[in-house]
Every structure is written in C-alpha cells, then in structure tokens.
Amino acid sequence: NEQYRALYKSVPFYIVFNSRFQYGIFFDNHFHTYFDLGKSYKDELKVEADGGNFNLFFIGGDTLKDIVTSYTSITGRTHLPQLFTLGHQQSRWSYMNEKEVLELAHNFRKYNIKCDVIHLDIDYMERYKVFTTSKESFPNFKEMVDSLHSSGFKVVTIIDPGTKVEKGYDTYEYLVNNKLCATLNGETYINEVWPGESIYPTFNKKETRDFWADEIKKLTDLGVDAIWDDMNEPASFKGPLPLDVDFAGTSHKEIHNLYGNFMAEATYDGLKKHTAKRPFVITRAAFSGTQKYSTIWTGDNQSLWHHLRANLPQLASLGLSGFAFAGSDLGGFGGDATPELLSRWVEAAIVYPLFRNHSAMGTIRQEPWVFDKKTTDIYRKFVDVRYELIPYIYDLFYKQTIDGIAPIRPLVLEYQEDENTYKLNDEVMLGSNILHAPVLDQGVDKRLVYLPKGKWYNYFTNEELEGGYHIVDAPIDTLPLYVKEGSILPIGTYETHVELLDELVLKVYKGSSTYIHYQDDGESFDYEQGKYNLYEISHVDDDIKVKLLHEGYKRYKKITAYYEGKKIDIKL
C-alpha cells in the first residue's frame, strides 16, 4: 500500500476468487517487481519486473485449497518442525548478560508460566561479531546454556550477514581471502551495520553457503539449539547497497530479494549438519520458497492496536503463500505495551504458529510478570491454552507437509461457499476445527463473531452456538474460541515445557468425524525412515474408536477421551 511500499519479504503470488471461480498467479521473478491490481485501470491486472525472465504460473483448481496445494508443490513446503518450536518463546533486544538470562528463566518457572525457548539478540556477541560470544557479559556461555537446558529451555541466538572488518577475526579473514564477499568496482564492498564497517557474504555462491554452514558449529558446540537470521535484506546503515554491488557475478539488483533465502539455506544446512535434528531457523528476509528452510516473522512491528489487528490477516495471507510457520512479535517490538494490549495480544497469539514475545531496547519490558498480577494471570491462562493446542498444531504441520495448507487459515479457505467469509479479517481458523475470534480493539468487552453454518462449542464453557452472527461477551480475560461440532482434538498435558507425552488425551465434541493424529520423537529426521505412528480416531458422539494406520514408533501407554465431561478410556 501507499504507507508501506516495501516490506522484508517478497512473495510474488496472489489468488483471485469469487463465487464462480478461483485461480492463482505466481510470478517467478526475483527482481524488483510491480503489481498493479486494478488501481490504474479497474479491469486491468499489470505485472512488471526490472529484469529477468517472465516466468508466470497460472494455477487453477476446483477450490482455494487446490491452488495453495499446487503453489506449494512448486515452491516447496515447510518441513516438520521440532516439537519445542511450537511452545512459548521469549525474546528481547537484548538480555544483556548471563545473570539476566538465568533470572529470566527462573522467573518463568517461579510464576508457573510455560516457556520453551529463550532468544539472545545481538548483545551476546563480542562487539557484534557474528559467531562470537562476549567474554565480558557472557564469560561462561556454554555453562549458561547447559543450565537453561537442564531447566527445560532451548536457546536461539541471532546472527547477521554483516561481518565485521577486523584483521585477525577469522570469519572476516576467510571471507575476504577466499573472495566470498560482495565487491564494488573490483574492491571488497564495505558498508556499516551493528559491528561498524562490515562486509557481505555472497550467499548465492555454494562455497560461501558451505563455509557459513560450518561456522554454525561454533554456536552448536556451545549448545545453541536454533538460529535467528536478521538484517538479511541485506540491511545497511550508510544507505542502501548500490544496485551494482557484485555478489559473485550477480548484481545486487538481481539478488536482493533472494539474499535472505540463500542465508536461510546456509543456516539450515549448518544446523542439520551439526545437530542432526530438524533445523529451527527464523529469518526476517525471504522469497517464495524460503519456507523450505526457515520460519519467518513479520518483522519490527509496534505496540499499537492497529498492528495487533494487522497480524491475523498478515499471518493468514502468509499461510496462503506457503509460509506455514510464521509469527508476529507478541506485544509489539517497538513502543510501549500496556497491560490491556499485552493481554489481548497473548489471547490473539495462541494460534500464531510462531508464538514469541519480543520487544526492543528502550521500551517498557513486556515479560508476563512485569505489569501486575491480573496481567500475569491472564498471560499464564492463555499460554496454558496454547500448550493444550500443541499436539493439534503439530498434527496440522504434519498434514501441511502433504497438502501445503498452513495451520492458520482465513475462514474462506474452509468455507469457500459462504460469501460472508470473503472479507472477514478479524477471525481465523486453526486447522479445520477451531475458530479464533480475539478482541483486537482497545477498551472493548464484547465483539461480533461470525460462525459458519453448523453447531459450534465454546472451547472454555462448552456453550453451544448455531452458525450466524453473535454478539459475545469478551471481558479482558476472555477469548472467543470455538470448536466445530464433531471435532476431535488431541490435548497437550505439559507441565513447564514441551516434552514427549506417554498418554494421548482427546477432547471429543458432539457429532461425528474422523481425525488423523501423528506421533514421532519430535526432533529427528527418523520419521523419513517410517519411524512414526498414525492413529485414525473416529466417533459418533461418545462411541470412540482408535486404530493404527502406521506403526513405526513406540505407542502411547494410554489413550483417554473426554466427551461432555465424561472420561472414557480407549484401547487400540
């Protein structure tokens, strides 16, 4: 739009639909592109690019889901994530030293607020040099990480592409001496980012990616579990990179939109090589297809109500565009959150695939306990709801690897025949079974909710509602969250953080349906060798049956269902 003419990511894909037809357009061109969708001329759609080939995919299908499935078969799908990545994550620019990080972890357990991940922003580094740790602020980095691991936390560290110009700094020396950095007029190109004068790796070159992947070992050897790629548009402090900066024979003009994608690929390869686990990478810059390597977030948002309102349509649109694993900074990154805004944001965020609280230096702290007891209690309540939903979300990610349909969805994707869903952007579906209608406005204790045809049940009270429009009460500690009739939901029973469960707990709702539940070790690639279980769960009201469709992993020791308040023990 006119206010935000360029964002962190380039995804040249859109869908056109009405009550009669639907199609998708993917413009496979990574140069600077322009889309004029009827603005200049009402009946004209215009697509242009500053260079490259005109590779245009016209994607048809009987439904919107068909289009998304076809599009993701072209660009790739998000790999099955590690289970812990679906948990609550805490970040700030920055937690400045070991004492602050360990106190943060202690407070999550003290206040009984579930949390799986702590993120370390740029100040953990030695003078912002990538692949280093500060000897002054983090003198015992590995011991700190070990302590966090023993308390059930994983650790994510940020890295940037900008590599400090410093004689004797091995990462810099290798990149320069092996000509693996950008040049201008035949000389190493230097701009400024956090470390000061910096060079830019040529991630479009395989040799550079391989080197970067091996550098990741410096962090994984310290126990780091995952990597957050930032500033990889690439960002610069002394003006944008000139378009003729040379990246291994390719101009910045051509590579700009792909730079973050190549960095994410290198980071993914490094984590896979040096941990043998499913890589958890988060990237700020991305292009169509980056979902194969990385989770994304929407970037540096603000603690503003209209930014909260923007999150649901943003994440639903990213899901339609192949980015199944996406999130926005819970509470807002810039500016000061208030108790009300933080409370409403955590309620909204329980369905974000990436569930991370993040804020900027110089802003009011927004950890769950910093305001007052009421806010802390609300925050805890909805983090608990998120953890109940994790097995269901994990199932959605498994299904996404097959059909490309993201966990978070606009209502129209599930109810395309219902024209009332066409312009709804303040409600979303989590999978096919849960409708999420958070309060997104300040000072509001009621909201209008639209429920598609059929019966729906309040997730918290089990109140039954018919499809249609409803004005519902939603005081500050209440979230309008509804489950479709007949649904079967696997429920997480975690204590402080995500762990493998011995018991499968199901919530079963009046009606009938069949549900497929996926189980594996939650971290390795063993599932690619068939080491997983698939359970088919079917029911007509309280007559519940479970059978194994595929067995390659240890079974649950116990399966328990809850139907209308009644506990039912189930045998395979």
Feature annotation, model-predicted:
Residues 478-570:
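Accessory, solvent-exposed terminal regions and/or long lumenal/extracellular loops of proteins
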Residues 1-477:
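Catalytic-domain carbohydrate-binding cleft regions of carbohydrate-active enzymes
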Residues 450-461, 560-572:
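Solvent-exposed beta-hairpin/edge-strand motifs
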